[in-house]
Amino acid sequence: MEPLKSHTGKAAVLNRINVDTDQIIPKQFLKRIERTGYGRFAFFDWRYDANGEPNPEFELNQPVYQGASILIAGENFGCGSSREHAPWALDDYGFKIIIAPSFADIFHQNCFKNGMLPIRMPYDNWKQLVGQYENKSLQMTVDLEKQLIHDSEGNQISFEVDPHWKEMLINGYDEISLTLLLEDDIKQFESQRSSWLQA
Amino acid sequence: MMPRTIIEKIWDQHIVKHGEGKPDLLYIDLHLIHEVTSPQAFEGLRQKGRKVRRPQNTFATMDHNIPTVNRFEIKDEVAKRQVTALERNCEEFGVRLADLHSVDQGIVHVVGPELGLTLPGKTIVCGDSHTSTHGAFGALAFGIGTSEVEHVLSTQTLWQQRPKTLEVRVDGTLQKGVTAKDVILAVIGKYGVKFGTGYVIEYTGEVFRNMTMDERMTVCNMSIEAGARAGLIAPDEVTFEYCKNRKYTPKGEEFDKAVEEWKALRTDPGAVYDKSIVLDGNKISPMVTWGINPGMVLPVDSEVPAPESFSAEDDKKEAIRAYEYMGLTPHQKIEDIKVEHVFIGSCTNSRMTDLRQAADMIKGKKVADSVRAIVVPGSQSVKLQAEKEGLDQIFLEAGFEWRESGCSMCLSMNNDVVPEGERCASTSNRNFEGRQGKGARTHLVSPAMAAMAAIHGHFVDVRKFYQEKTVV
């Protein structure tokens, strides 16, 4: 996994609550057996009209947001299905960082596993960010090591992150390789299980 | 020892390595697999030269994108490739697979319990958010992403943050016609779609105690719709009776030994939950969703809410989106909403209890001319049992289609799609935009309510059915 220490990019705002993974990547695109190439399907039903043309009403289609790599999203982002195709699609679309007041648990975890940083931000701070970035073409820097977001206009805001995931992202660790080092612990655990569980 | 909840007990029993200030490394007893979320995980193993650590703890079936008519003819080439990939992966890595030829095939959350793979006290995962279903047995069961599927395949463990605990207590007696589906929809309607985020739920109280295993599965299934990755019900005699003599359940003395262990799986007196909520079961009505998430739900005898009734600005904005998408207007009576489609099926409501409840409503009646209605049994075993009981004939005579088992119109990955702008009374779990097809309008209901909607062409309070019965 590519380490993620700090990221600078344009921020886009999608100020809707309860954006579910069916919207992030509709089910017709889950039939592929690859892990890449989902970006063009991200938000498909919102993003394109019936003729396959970009829908001008959809927030992320605004010219000011083109090339954005940081998504400022609404509450309960990523709710619904466990499909990891959702973070794959967002990543492939270009988003590395997602900032929201709250995330669904499975989606939140899936982001970390793909080297993306989901930041849970207290509602008032988040609201302030929305005000600063909505309908604008503005860059921000997300410094994971310092847990600080700042921009060229002098705005600065700190954020919380789980220390475990911070370490994993900064070092770009492969989780499975780390767990495999604990083989002895796993074996030991297995040897003590009830017999009905061994069947 | 400090009194503990059942959630903490199961958690503690599965810690391989306690992470100080970190997630715990949890042992996984059962890993269920299906065709959609596993191919990339197997590919990861292949690339790194890794093996499946415990094929005997892994079980696969195909359910998400298989046809429910002419099931062996998958016309969609991309979907077919996914099914073929599962067959190849299971063979190469030595994983048991219930394929389309198997009598054990069905929706992964229906067959796990049927086969006795799902048992109390186990940790169970699957690359599917409705894995919470298995919590009905007093198991700790939750959905995972594909990276985690790969992690479990190669290590039989997962790093997990210890969850907070949430008690959802429903006491009292349900009115005739009010079902498990209505109970869970009422809970989500009252507390919203994210009150369970970060928690594992334990459902307690008389109402859940009086439920069959099928009904308990319906409740736990929709824990994820409340934001909780997992929801469970402490096992009791009903659970033990269900588990006895299933294909993979331990037999004889081993079973008795297991039951002794399962009896300890209950929340100790004095144990404290991080949060508790209470509902009065007597007051729950048959529920119908009107909007674009399962929290937008109301008793059948009410009206679509007005935008003014939402105090938070965000909720109001979402409600306005919902009216537009659903083609509804504020103050419209729920019972006046007409449906063109009825779907009885999904991992929420496709088991024997569900089919029996629906069949009861339609016996000797006809599906309205304006409605297309389908029944998709959750598994081959449910299908066979229903046919043995003659339920298929009741459905067919009423004008329902009787299909082969699979996920079908719950997420419409196969050809079972609701056309744009049309409305479906559905026993599934999600009424998200586009879930049953682009522009399709989904109303989540119980099997009994869906059956009544099929007959009348619009929603009808199922309690009236029982009143009529009493009068006659």
Swiss-Prot record, chain B:
Cross-referenced Pfam families: Aconitase
An example molecular function term from Gene Ontology annotations: metal ion binding
Obligatory cofactor(s): [4Fe-4S] cluster
InterPro entries: 3-IsopropMal_deHydase_lsu (IPR004430), Acnase/IPM_dHydase_lsu_aba_1/3 (IPR015931), Acoase/IPM_deHydtase_lsu_aba (IPR001030), Aconitase_4Fe-4S_BS (IPR018136), Aconitase_4Fe-4S_dom (IPR036008), IPM_dehydratase_rel_enz (IPR050067), IPMI_cat (IPR033941)
Cofactor binding: number and manner: Binds 1 [4Fe-4S] cluster per subunit.
The organism's place on the tree of life at top rank: Bacteria
GO terms of biological process kind: L-leucine biosynthetic process
Species, as recorded: Bacillus subtilis (strain 168)
Stated name of the protein: 3-isopropylmalate dehydratase large subunit
Task performed by this protein: Catalyzes the isomerization between 2-isopropylmalate and 3-isopropylmalate, via the formation of 2-isopropylmaleate.
Induction trigger: By superoxide.
Reaction(s) catalysed (UniProt annotation): (2R,3S)-3-isopropylmalate = (2S)-2-isopropylmalate
Sequence similarity: Belongs to the aconitase/IPM isomerase family. LeuC type 1 subfamily.
EC number: 4.2.1.33
Binding site for [4Fe-4S] cluster: C347, C407, C410
Entry keyword set: 4Fe-4S, Amino-acid biosynthesis, Branched-chain amino acid biosynthesis, Iron, Iron-sulfur, Leucine biosynthesis, Lyase, Metal-binding
